Amino acid sequence: MILIDTNILIDLFAEDPDWKGRSLVAFRLAKSRDALAINDIVYAELAPGFPNVAELDAALAALDVAVVPTAKSALFLAGHVYQRYRRQQGTKLNVLPDFFIGAHAAVENAQLLTRDARRVKAYFPTVEVISP
C-alpha cells in the first residue's frame, strides 16, 4: 500500500498550475507500483473542497484511492513525534496532520506520496517517500 498525502490530491483536484503535472506523474508511478490509499486525516483535510461526502467519495473512487483508518499505534507515534517537534522549538500548538500521516506510513511500513519529503524524512526516517 502507498499512502497519499493531502497535498498531492489537492494538486490533482484543484488543478494547481504549478504542481498538477508533477504530482500527476508521481501519482501514476505510485499507482503502477501498489494499491493507493489515504487515511481519515487526509479525508478530513480534503473535505472542504467538496460539497458532500458522496462527491468526495466519487472523486477518490475515480482515482482508485481507498480510505483506511489510522491505527492507534500511529496516533500514539504522532503524539510522540509532535512532542519532539515542540521540544525543538516547533510553534504549532496542536499535533499537525502531517505527523498523523507520516506516523501512519511508518507504522504500516507503507510508502508515502507527498510533496513534503524533507519534513517526513526529518521525523519519520524509516518512511520511503515518493515525491514529485
Language-model features and meaning:
Residues 51-73:
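Active-site-proximal, substrate-binding regions of enzyme catalytic domains
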Residues 1-38, 47-59, 130:
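Short, well-structured N-terminal submotif of metal-dependent ribonuclease cores
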Residues 4-5, 38-39, 94-95, 116-117:
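Histidine- and aromatic-rich ligand-binding microenvironments
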Residues 2, 35-37, 64-69, 111:
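Short loop->beta-strand "edge-of-pocket" segments that line small-molecule binding or catalytic clefts
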